[in-house]
């Protein structure tokens, strides 16, 4: 820094070295921050950082793409700022830490927006054109918001899943996993949203309470002789009755095709006024009570004995369309926790039902599937054709009542699947889809996808550690991945399918590459406009284009393929060092990325996963419009500053929920002011210091200065170990403690006398400034990852010839040879000082003294404390900030004490110390000898403080 004082002030007769700085006390963050954002863009600071970091070891934090729809919210701010802090910390640690932001662009939310604005009848080409334009507009809007938060990155060259290169890359990734044998087509129940008109990924399902009618339904005996044999009877005592099921989905009854019993559960044949009822023995008493019946158990048998015994459909007497029977199949998933211990099976609408029926030999063509994609029954369905399944529920209950099959019904509130976009109930629905098989063994390894992914989890670092088990259990238990979707705005599964057999064209892999080349030039629109004859020639008449698009989780889940090794391969690399997202992404981006990389590369695309929690209000409640407790990051940035948001995030343990409220923000703002005041003191007292000209070597430093630098070095090492583990809240806590207690409450307080009163160019003052110079260097760099605006503002004053603090690396503190001994000694001294400070406060309360400088103290000390105190000699009073200090040796800690007396001497006009030599010089009657020497003589000699 220059040796010029910042402002000229009226000169005192006896001036002190009281300097100023252009670094203001008030941050005025809402006004200054946008200026820094503008300057960083205009000066291309991100590019400057890249140039400075070139050749270093790379560190890649791969950005999980937010969806290109809507304004950024507080969750976005948390996510992007955490990423920004890590990237900046890694750059400062000496890495080439690149940050390429990205956006997820295809899929339902944008398609819904286009439908809202332009209706549902637009041609596909127009939907795509408008979807691209809409996504581009949303990206630009979000980009401005992220930059405003101080996030540095390659904003002018982000990745977008809708860029032609990326769309083509997805098609090539699909071809690769097909080549390996992971992809198959089949009929399976998948999560289906009627409003989307499409299958949903597991990550697109949320659970909310829903109230439905539950029903206990009687399936009458169709094979009484076989039933009797199963129970070890020669014949049934009576013909009336049957087997009873319980379900929360009456709408599935028309599609019933089987009944499931557990092979080992004991079932009872119970004689009741309603006939013979088959129930799980454990549930007999509870069920009869609910039905208002009494009964006697006639016989019992394990479920295995009843296999393949048939029962009549409960609506058989209501309409000929239901004159069919349901066989008993066995299933280990059946329990006796609720219901009757018997599960009715509609294989089109339940995963376990489907698996059970298929395992018992049911062909796909035999599966009854009357629910259409919009949630209505097909018109030909008996009794309920054309009705919505939800509207049909009460009518089905009524029809069962009329048929004599209804044992009981009541309303039941349970946690039920909903679409995360439409917030409407969804169902399992069997459709013909393309899947990636979790338990398929590909042709290049003997491990299944599930095994490869689970092995990859074992080799991944998790922050926090509990994320490992969460992801592991999800992968271990998940079904096959439904890759296909029935939408327009998405990357096509660009297959040609035989019109009669449904088989893929034998040249599918080759054709996918040809389509990818066209998409690379013209986008996915190239597939929509493609005439099959262009690629198939004479085969075109036998094949049709597959109309399915890829799950958008495949879009983002393959960014390690089409971004890290595709569109941005020159900047990025595979695998990424870190993926960082909210805890919901264990079933989202972390999950899909793991599966695609396991298929493509046999390993995860990341070396480590970091998970952060969600934002809640001060009372721990989830933020919602209905509660009115949401906090808009733009509003906070414009009112308090983005720096306050950044400091709040950094100071909160992100591994759990991140609580925010006006009271919390107020506390964060107060903490920010303390840090800013510390910086202002440092910069002001370095404003006449030029390192090249004024710095003193370590051997010339006063003891307390060596201690302060040794303490700062330890702090930096401690903080860097936290940065290495992506732990920010301990960093903030320790920096704030350092600023308020180690610096403000001790070192800087002690230093003021030396900085202000010794000769401007004295060894004592330059020693202090040299230490402050190193402390400022260290502190600014340590805080730069989270207080980026403030660190840059201070840095430009501190080091005006440097382009930006973000091209620096962490400060190399000079080695202090006696650091260990000093740290031990000054720990003792600070403890003694605390005792003195307490005694001074008691004296002040008793009106014995005013300021501490009015006091003289006598310290009675023993052992190491005595040695430490006496080693400072006459400098002890400066450490205690008293006018005089003496130390008396005692034999034990029990005898230790502090005595305070008011000084009887005059106060020096300049240094405010009370000294016997004030007025000793007749020409300067208000000065002490120390100040006279500092102003007009050779200056005082300091050794310790």
UniProtKB/Swiss-Prot annotation:
Compartments in which it is found: Cytoplasm
SUPFAM superfamilies referenced in this protein's UniProt entry, alphabetically: Anticodon-binding domain of a subclass of class I aminoacyl-tRNA synthetases, Nucleotidylyl transferase, ValRS/IleRS/LeuRS editing domain
Binding site for Zn(2+): 908, 911, 928, 931
UniProt binding sites for ATP: 625
Record Gene3D superfamilies: 1.10.730.20, HUPs (3.40.50.620), Valyl/Leucyl/Isoleucyl-tRNA synthetase, editing domain (3.90.740.10)
GO biological process, one term: isoleucyl-tRNA aminoacylation
Disulphide-bridged cysteine pairs: none
Residues bound to L-isoleucyl-5'-AMP: 581
UniProt keyword terms in alphabetical order: Aminoacyl-tRNA synthetase, ATP-binding, Cytoplasm, Ligase, Metal-binding, Nucleotide-binding, Protein biosynthesis, Zinc
Keyword Cell inner membrane attributed: no
GO MF, one annotated term: zinc ion binding
Annotated InterPro entries: aa-tRNA-synth_I_CS, aa-tRNA-synth_Ia, Anticodon_Ile_BEm, Ile-tRNA-ligase, Ile-tRNA-ligase_type1, Ile-tRNA_ligase, M/V/L/I-tRNA-synth_anticd-bd, Rossmann-like_a/b/a_fold
Family matches, as CDD domains: Anticodon_Ia_Ile_BEm (cd07960), IleRS_core (cd00818)
Residue interval(s) of motif 'KMSKS' region: 622-626
Cofactor remark from the record: Binds 1 zinc ion per subunit.
Enzyme class, first EC level, given as a word: ligase
GO cellular component terms, A-Z: cytosol
Catalytic activity: tRNA(Ile) + L-isoleucine + ATP = L-isoleucyl-tRNA(Ile) + AMP + diphosphate
HAMAP family in UniProt: Ile_tRNA_synth_type1
Functional note: Catalyzes the attachment of isoleucine to tRNA(Ile). As IleRS can inadvertently accommodate and process structurally similar amino acids such as valine, to avoid such errors it has two additional distinct tRNA(Ile)-dependent editing activities. One activity is designated as 'pretransfer' editing and involves the hydrolysis of activated Val-AMP. The other activity is designated 'posttransfer' editing and involves deacylation of mischarged Val-tRNA(Ile).
UniProt-recorded name of the protein: Isoleucine--tRNA ligase
Organism: Paraburkholderia phytofirmans (strain DSM 17436 / LMG 22146 / PsJN)
């Amino acid at each position: 820094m220059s040796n010029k004082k910042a402002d000229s002030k009226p000169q005192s007769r006896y001036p002190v070295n009281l300097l100023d700085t252009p670094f203001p006390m008030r941050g005025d963050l809402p006004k200054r921050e946008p200026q820094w954002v503008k300057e960083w863009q205009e000066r291309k600071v991100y590019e400057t950082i890249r140039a400075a970091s070139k050749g270093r070891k790379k560190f890649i934090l791969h950005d999980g793409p937010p969806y290109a729809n809507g304004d950024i919210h507080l969750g976005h701010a948390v996510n992007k700022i955490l990423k920004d802090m890590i990237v900046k910390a890694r750059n400062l640690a000496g890495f080439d830490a690149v940050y390429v932001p990205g956006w997820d662009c295809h899929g339902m939310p944008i398609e819904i927006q286009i439908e809202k604005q332009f209706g549902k009848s637009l041609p596909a080409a127009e939907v795509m054109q408008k979807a691209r334009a809409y996504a581009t507009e949303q990206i630009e809007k979000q980009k401005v918001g992220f930059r405003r938060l101080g996030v540095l990155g390659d904003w002018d060259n982000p990745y977008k899943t809708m860029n032609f290169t990326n769309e083509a890359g997805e098609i090539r990734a699909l071809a690769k996993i097909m080549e390996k044998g992971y992809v198959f087509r089949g009929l399976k129940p998948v999560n289906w949203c009627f409003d989307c008109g499409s299958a949903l990924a597991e990550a697109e399902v949320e659970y909310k309470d829903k109230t439905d009618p539950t029903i206990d339904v009687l399936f009458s005996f169709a094979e009484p002789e076989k039933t009797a044999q199963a129970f070890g009877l020669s014949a049934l005592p009576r013909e009336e009755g049957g087997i009873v099921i319980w379900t929360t989905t009456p709408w599935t009854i028309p599609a019933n095709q089987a009944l499931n019993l557990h092979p080992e559960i004991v079932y009872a044949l119970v004689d009741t006024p309603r006939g013979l009822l088959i129930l799980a023995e454990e549930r007999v008493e509870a069920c009869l009570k609910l039905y208002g019946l009494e009964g006697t158990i006639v016989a019992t048998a394990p479920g295995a004995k009843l296999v393949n015994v048939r029962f009549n459909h409960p609506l058989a007497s209501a309409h000929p369309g239901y004159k069919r029977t349901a066989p008993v199949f066995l299933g280990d998933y059946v329990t006796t926790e609720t219901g009757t211990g018997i599960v009715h099976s509609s294989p089109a609408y339940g995963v376990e039902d489907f698996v059970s029926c298929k395992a018992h030999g049911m062909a796909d063509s035999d599966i009854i599937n009357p629910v259409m994609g919009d949630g209505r029954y097909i018109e030909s369905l008996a009794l309920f054709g054309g009705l919505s399944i939800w509207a049909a529920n009460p009518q089905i209950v009524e029809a069962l009542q009329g048929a004599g099959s209804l044992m009981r019904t009541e309303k039941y509130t349970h946690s039920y699947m909903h679409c995360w976009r439409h917030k409407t109930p969804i169902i399992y629905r069997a459709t013909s889809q393309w899947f990636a098989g979790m338990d398929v063994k590909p042709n290049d390894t003997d491990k299944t996808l599930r095994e490869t992914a689970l092995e990859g989890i074992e080799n991944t670092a998790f922050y926090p550690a509990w994320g490992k088990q969460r992801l592991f259990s999800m992968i271990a238990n998940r079904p096959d991945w439904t890759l296909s979707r029935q939408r327009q705005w998405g990357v096509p599964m660009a297959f040609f399918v035989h019109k009669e057999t449904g088989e893929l064209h034998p040249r599918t892999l080759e054709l996918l590459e040809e389509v990818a080349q066209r998409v690379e030039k013209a986008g996915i629109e190239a597939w929509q406009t493609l005439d099959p004859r262009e690629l198939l020639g004479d085969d075109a008449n036998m094949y049709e284009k597959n109309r399915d698009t890829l799950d958008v989780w495949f879009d983002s889940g393959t960014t390690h393929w089409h971004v890290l090794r595709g569109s941005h391969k020159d900047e990025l690399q595979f695998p990424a060092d870190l993926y960082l997202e909210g805890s919901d992404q264990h079933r989202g981006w972390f999950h899909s990325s793991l599966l695609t990389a396991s298929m493509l590369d046999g390993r995860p695309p990341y070396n480590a996963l970091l998970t952060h929690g969600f934002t809640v209000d001060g009372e721990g409640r989830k933020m919602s419009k209905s509660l009115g407790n949401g906090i808009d990051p733009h509003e906070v940035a414009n009112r308090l500053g983005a720096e306050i948001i950044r400091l709040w995030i950094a100071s909160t343990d992100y591994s759990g929920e991140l609580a925010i409220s006006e009271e919390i923000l107020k506390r964060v703002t107060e903490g920010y002011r303390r840090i800013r005041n510390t910086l202002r003191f440092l910069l002001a007292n370095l404003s006449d210091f030029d390192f090249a000209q004024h710095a003193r070597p370590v051997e010339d430093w006063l003891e307390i200065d060596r201690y302060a630098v040794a303490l700062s070095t330890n702090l930096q090492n401690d903080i860097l170990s936290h940065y290495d583990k992506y732990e920010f809240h301990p960093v903030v806590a320790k920096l704030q403690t350092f600023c308020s207690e180690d610096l403000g409450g001790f070192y800087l307080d002690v230093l003021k006398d030396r900085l202000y009163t010794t000769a401007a160019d004295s060894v004592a003052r330059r020693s202090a400034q040299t230490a402050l110079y190193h402390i400022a260097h260290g502190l600014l760099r340590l805080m730069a990852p989270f207080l980026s605006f403030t660190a840059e503002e201070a840095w430009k004053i501190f080091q005006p010839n440097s382009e930006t603090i973000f091209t620096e690396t962490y400060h190399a503190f000079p080695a202090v040879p006696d650091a260990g001994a000093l740290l031990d000694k000054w720990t003792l001294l600070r403890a003694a000082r605390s005792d003195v400070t307490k005694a001074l406060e008691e004296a002040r309360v008793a009106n014995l003294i005013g300021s501490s400088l009015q006091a003289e103290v006598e310290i009675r000390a023993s052992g190491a404390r005595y040695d430490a105190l006496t080693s400072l000699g006459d400098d002890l009073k400066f450490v205690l900030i008293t006018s005089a200090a003496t130390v008396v040796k005692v034999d034990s800690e029990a005898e230790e004490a502090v005595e305070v007396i008011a000084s009887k001497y005059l106060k020096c006009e300049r240094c405010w110390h009370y000294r016997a030599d004030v007025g000793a010089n007749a020409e300067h009657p208000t000065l002490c000898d120390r100040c006279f020497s500092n102003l007009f003589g050779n200056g005082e000699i300091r050794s310790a403080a």
